[in-house]
Curated annotation (Swiss-Prot):
Subcellular location per the Swiss-Prot or TrEMBL entry: Cytoplasm, Cytoskeleton, Actin patch
Biased composition (Acidic residues): 370-386, 417-429, 632-643, 757-772, 807-820
Biased composition (Basic and acidic residues): 10-20, 54-78, 225-258
UniProt-recorded name of the protein: Altered inheritance of mitochondria protein 21
Gene that this polypeptide is encoded by: AIM21
Function: Involved in mitochondrial migration along actin filaments.
Length: 847
């Protein structure tokens, strides 16, 4: 509880300082809105949840109107994109006074604040992970952290302008001197930021001193603000050994600080210093994460050497715990910031919980051995800082490229080294506080002079940091675990690069440029709309391509060329015209061809069947003019006239061909005559004659005469030839009906009987005996077909006169009157019936 009370008092004092800074346009509140755009530009800074964020929630409670006014004032004051305050987010996240005061407070808690810087980067990534896992709690923390970063960003911008001239080391010892009692003094003197913020400011200032002492490139990368980077670069030379040990300690703290509860407690205990340190770390981490290739170790040390970073940029809160209360606050701050940093996927392989971070921070409290060496080297580094700043300003652009190439692997490696160093830093933290406080006081005096130069340089680095932030974050996530063992080597290379190159501070300035788009639109704003314009330009080009006019017509050839071409092609044109004229007479041919196509069936037999003589295709008929010599001569004359007409139409121009290559006249005037090799001859191939046919009379043979005589005799006998013919036909039909049973003799007998009946009226009994009974039945059936009346009369006569004589039969027949045509048939039938009946009677009678 005692630790929480000083934190509350620090928060009240930070609020009072913020109110004082509002008229000076450097209050923490306006700085927060500026840091917000920076967070938007760099994904890491936007989402980083730090102790500062938890402590910054008090200023967030203030009305938004005041915050907006302060933001506008800060933007007005910050004409240049105040990039240096980004690295100072942890150290001097608020106005220059607040930055120095916070740095002094951070010296009290220097050790915890240093890990917080690396954790700021990790916190950014971890806050994103915590937002997904923990829900609104992590989101509220991230928003509070963003606002705290925003408040710190403008302050860093102002402080960065102030700090570059003199390193923040003097302000850091002030924070160290503050300890628990001095922290209260800083609360009154610090900016209106919550006590955690001044502690974080002290932590970033200490981080600035220590990375300079360590001379590792990690520290320059961490101070995303120019001022913080300059302080870090100066302090890296002094804190080379301490930075490596503290980086290892920070890793240990982050591994232990994976739990969420101790982090919140640390934030409540040391909110001002840790939040400021974490904000600086957040800004530095996005820059380092964005610039992993440009400054590999800086980003990792921003995570894992936050003690050095905060000592160099501002008093390191983790290494400064002189008193028990300050040590606890600093350790909590370090655990919160450092644990948050490693919780992020970029710094730690697993999603670190806040509890593990608190444990690591508690371990960092005792780690002060490395800070003793840092205090010894800080005094020397402070002198070198000014020289390094000058060199860095000259070589910012070139060094940024080099740092962008290195950082990804070194960041994770440095974290492990920092954790190891932090283990022994707590013992010597008391000495470091006094030295860092003195250094911070010196820095507080000088910062106003150095501010104008640093903000100009960082915008260049802003572009680099923005380009590299996303890559660094991804690289940190992938490479955070394996490269940890290489801590000592990489920090040394980074320190050398950081001392020579102020590229790291410029990168944080790049992040600020997006946040302060109005003040520095050149580096980022014009480029982005330029890219949008480029995107819109292809659309316009597409529309223009669609609406392109037709290609321009080719220019007319010169008169000489045209004449020469005409000379070459005129004969072809004349010949083509002649062909057209000759084919004009053949225009009806298509009709004939159509006929031939219609008669496709006939065409199929071409070459297969023998054509009739004289048949040919009408299309193949020769021209009559070709056959006659006179006609061919006339055609030639017509062709010549046509050629003359064509040449007359052509403009008369002298055609100049190749000189010295004229053809002889015999060749030039040669006339080509084409004669057909076929000769046509006409003649009669076949003819037709039509004649009347002559009917030849047939010769009558002897047999025919005999037949005719028989017929004549029959006619005379019957009195009518037709009757005999009818009788013969009837007899033949009867024979057919009787079938094979009737013999020829029977038929003859019947015929003879009929003839006898016609002639004599006598009927032979022998004939009746020969007729079978079946024949009689059939004749009866045939009689039914004949007239019924006649049959009845015949039947009556036959029944009454069965056994009459021939004479009686003849008399009765004469009485009957029958048609000549029907008589013979009926007579025959009657006779047959009578004969059949007589036959039956004869059969019945006994012999």
């Amino acid at each position: 509880m005692s630790d929480l009370e000083p934190s509350e008092s620090l928060n009240h004092e930070s609020d009072s300082h913020l109110e004082q800074l509002k008229p000076s346009t450097t209050p923490s509140i306006p700085a927060r809105p500026q840091s917000r755009p920076q967070k938007q530009t760099t994904t890491t800074t936007t989402k980083v949840p730090t102790d500062q964020d938890s402590n910054d929630k008090t200023p967030l409670e203030k009305p938004q109107d005041e915050l907006d006014q302060l933001a506008h004032e800060i933007e007005k004051v910050l004409t240049d994109p105040v990039i240096p305050p980004r690295p100072q987010h942890g150290s001097s996240a608020k106005p220059n006074e607040t930055q120095t005061e916070h740095k002094e407070q951070d010296f009290g808690s220097a050790h915890p604040v240093i890990p917080s810087r690396p954790t700021n980067k990790k916190e950014t990534i971890e806050t994103e992970m915590v937002d997904q896992n923990n829900g609104l709690e992590s989101k509220s923390d991230s928003t509070a952290n963003k606002e705290s970063l925003e408040n710190q960003v403008p302050i860093d911008e102002d402080s960065t302008h102030v700090k570059p001239s003199i390193p923040n080391v003097p302000s850091r010892p002030q924070n160290r001197d503050l300890d628990s009692s001095e922290v209260d003094n800083t609360k009154a003197s610090t900016t209106p930021s919550i006590p955690a913020r001044p502690q974080r400011q002290t932590a970033p200032t200490q981080n600035e001193h220590k990375p300079q002492v360590s001379n590792t490139p990690v520290i320059p990368t961490r101070p995303q603000t120019k001022t913080e980077k300059l302080h870090l670069n100066e302090e890296l030379d002094k804190l080379d050994g301490e930075s490596s040990s503290k980086n290892q300690e920070n890793k240990r703290h982050t591994d232990d600080n994976n739990t969420s509860k101790p982090i919140y407690e640390a934030e409540s205990i040391v909110p001002p210093e840790e939040k400021e340190g974490e904000t600086a770390n957040k800004q530095a981490l996005p820059t380092t994460s964005t610039d992993p290739p440009a400054e590999p170790t800086a980003s990792t040390r921003g995570f894992r050497l936050p003690l050095h970073m905060q000592q160099s940029s501002g008093p390191i809160s983790t290494s400064t715990p002189v008193t028990g209360s300050e040590a606890e606050l600093n350790s909590l701050d370090n655990s919160n910031t450092f644990g948050d940093g490693e919780i992020t996927p970029g710094n730690s392989d697993t999603k670190a919980t806040f509890k593990s971070d608190e444990d690591v921070e508690n371990n960092n409290r005792t780690d002060s051995s490395s800070f003793d060496d840092d205090m010894e080297t800080i005094s020397q580094d402070q002198e070198d800082r000014e020289e390094d700043r000058r060199h860095r300003q000259e070589t910012t652009t070139g060094e940024n490229v080099q740092e962008s190439e290195d950082p990804q692997f070194e960041t994770t490696i440095i974290e492990s080294g920092e954790i190891e160093e932090r283990d022994g830093d707590d013992t010597d933290s008391g000495e470091l506080y006094s030295e860092q406080q003195q250094n911070k006081e010196k820095e507080d005096v000088v910062p106003a002079t150095s501010t104008p130069k640093i903000p100009q340089r960082p915008p260049k680095k802003q572009s680099l940091s923005r380009a590299t932030t996303d890559d660094s974050l991804t690289s940190l996530d992938n490479t955070s675990k394996p490269p940890k063992p290489v801590v000592p080597k990489r920090p040394t290379s980074e320190e050398s690069s950081s001392n020579l190159e102020p590229t790291i501070p410029t990168r944080p300035s790049i992040k600020k440029a997006p946040s302060i788009g109005e003040s520095d639109p050149e580096p980022i704003v014009p480029n982005r709309p330029g890219n949008k314009e480029l995107e819109s330009i292809p659309r316009d080009t597409q529309t223009s391509i669609k609406s392109k006019p037709p290609p321009p017509k080719p220019k007319k050839l010169s008169s000489k060329i045209a004449a020469f071409q005409q000379q070459l092609f005129n004969p072809m044109n004349a010949s083509s015209e002649e062909d057209v004229g000759s084919t004009g007479s053949k225009q009806p041919e298509p009709g004939i061809r159509k006929r031939s196509t219609e008669n496709s069936i006939l065409s199929r037999f071409g070459g297969k069947a023998i054509p009739l003589p004289g048949m040919f295709n009408p299309n193949q008929m020769p021209k009559p003019s070709i056959s006659h010599g006179e006609e061919t001569s006339d055609d030639k004359e017509e062709k010549e006239e046509k050629e003359e007409n064509v040449t007359a139409n052509v403009p008369v121009r002298r055609t100049r061909g190749p000189r010295g290559k004229k053809l002889p006249k015999a060749v030039a005037d040669a006339e080509i005559k084409t004669e057909s090799r076929f000769t046509i001859e006409s003649g009669k191939l076949w003819s037709l004659e039509f004649k009347r046919e002559i009917k030849e009379e047939k010769e009558i043979g002897h047999s025919d005469l005999e037949k005719s005589k028989i017929l004549v005799d029959d006619v005379e006998a019957d009195g009518d030839g037709e009757e005999k013919a009818a009788e013969n036909e009837v007899i033949e039909s009867q024979e057919n009906t009787i079938g094979d049973k009737l013999e020829h003799n029977d038929v003859v007998n019947i015929a003879s009987a009929a003839a006898d009946i016609d002639n004599d009226g006598d009927v032979d009994d022998d004939d009746d005996d020969d007729v079978p009974p079946e024949v009689n039945e059939r004749f009866i059936k045939d009689e039914e077909i004949s007239n019924v009346g006649i049959e009845r009369t015949i039947a009556s006569e036959t029944t009454t006169e069965k056994h009459s004589t021939d004479e009686e039969v003849e008399e009765e027949e004469e009485e009957l009157e029958v048609d000549s045509v029907d008589i013979p048939i009926r007579r025959v039938t009657v006779n047959t019936v009578d004969t059949i009946e007589d036959q039956k009677d004869v059969d019945d009678e006994p012999l």
